[in-house]
A protein has these predicted regions:
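Internal, hydrophobic cores of structured domains that mediate oligomerization or house catalytic pockets
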Residues: 38-161
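C-terminal interaction module
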Residues: 1-45, 153-345
Length: 345
């Protein structure tokens, strides 16, 4: 019997994700990113970008394509993606997603390592130190460090412009959050509850629940996270609804076998409530990028729809094309029926 392959898409792991306003697609950041990963023992060895035709190739033999993925975009492309893998223990993935036109409010950087690495020894502390080094590198507005299964089960789509999504095992809050919450309250949090509160060099803060990150979904840790939310103030949290398990397959949904009202319930949940949000740093840099994009000619609606795999239909209607079958669907009417985006609480 052959050896079972590693499930790169669904492996159990611990994830670090940063939401970054400040553009960080420079050669210096790309080089330092690899240096930090290597320093902590997580050097990747495989690469996939549009410049490798989305194929997985050996990183060291394709460094030009690595930097090109960070620095260049295809004509009319609205984003840049760099995907990395580490195929030896601890195995994991590293992804960079950058809005090339500056219209999306955040860029993303994430690192995921397999769960076994965190079960014993210094792995957890080493990963946390790497996270702090990456925080210093990209100056994010927000970051979370969590067991991946727990993070998926606890929240839906995270929208920082509607408030914090919740408290996770590790929480990086940029200086804008420190200013909004008040450092006195954050210091008191570390005294009153069994959590670690660390002031970061840029006056941001790191809140860690303690214990092992793999236990973050236990009742005790969930209660501790809830206590932190209560202490800081519920008005700062958006309380995004966790995703509901789908009682149907997407194949049946695309085939029109699922009633529109059921699709709306599970695929178009109500918006989360609006919480208090800070004034995010570096917004002027994103605005500058957007202006540069527009001066360069930007992209038409038709080109954007083509870029993401959609097509124009009629006077403004949009259809989605199933790449596997070639069948097209009118959205939202044909699949979801008429309906709004949901009501705020």
């Amino acid at each position: 019997m052959g050896k079972r392959g590693f499930d790169w898409d669904g492996f159990d792991g611990v994830i670090l994700t940063f939401w970054v306003v400040k553009p960080f697609d420079t050669r210096e950041v790309a080089q330092t990113f690899l240096g930090i990963l290597e320093h902590h023992g997580y050097a990747p060895d495989r690469l996939s970008t549009v410049w490798t035709k989305d194929r997985w190739v050996k990183l060291q033999q394709n460094m030009d394509e690595y930097y090109r993925g960070w620095l260049e975009r295809r004509p009319k492309a609205v984003s840049k993606h760099v995907m990395l893998r580490r195929t030896c223990y601890p195995r994991g993935t590293m992804n960079v997603d950058i809005s090339a036109d500056g219209r999306f409010p955040f860029d993303f950087l994430d690192v995921v390592l397999e769960a076994d690495y965190f079960r014993e020894g210094p792995g957890q502390q080493r990963f946390l130190q790497m996270a702090k080094d990456l925080y210093t590198l990209v100056n994010p507005a927000y970051g979370m460090l969590e067991d991946r299964d727990t993070s998926i089960s606890r929240t839906g789509i995270i929208d920082l412009e509607r408030g914090l999504p919740g408290i996770f095992w590790g929480n990086f809050l940029g200086p804008e959050y420190t200013a909004m919450l008040g450092w006195e309250k954050l210091e008191a949090l570390g005294r009153e509850l069994p959590v670690t509160v660390e002031r970061l060099p840029d006056d941001g803060v790191l809140i860690v629940l303690g214990g092992n990150v793999l236990d973050s979904g236990t009742p005790e840790m969930l209660a501790r996270a809830e206590a932190v939310e209560q202490f800081l103030g519920e008005e700062y949290f958006s309380k995004t609804s966790p995703p509901k398990p789908l009682p149907f397959s997407m194949t049946d949904a695309l085939a029109g076998k699922v009633p529109p009202e059921v699709l709306r319930k599970y695929l178009m949940p109500p918006k989360p409530r609006q919480g208090k949000v800070p004034e995010f740093r570096f917004r002027e840099l994103r605005q500058k990028r957007q202006e540069e994009w527009e001066r360069s000619g930007g992209i038409t609606v038709e080109e954007l729809i083509e870029e993401v795999g959609l097509e124009i239909k009629g006077p403004g209607g949009v259809i989605m094309v199933d790449a596997a079958t070639g069948k097209a669907y009118d959205l939202p009417g044909e699949m979801f029926g008429e309906g709004d985006e949901g009501e705020e609480e």
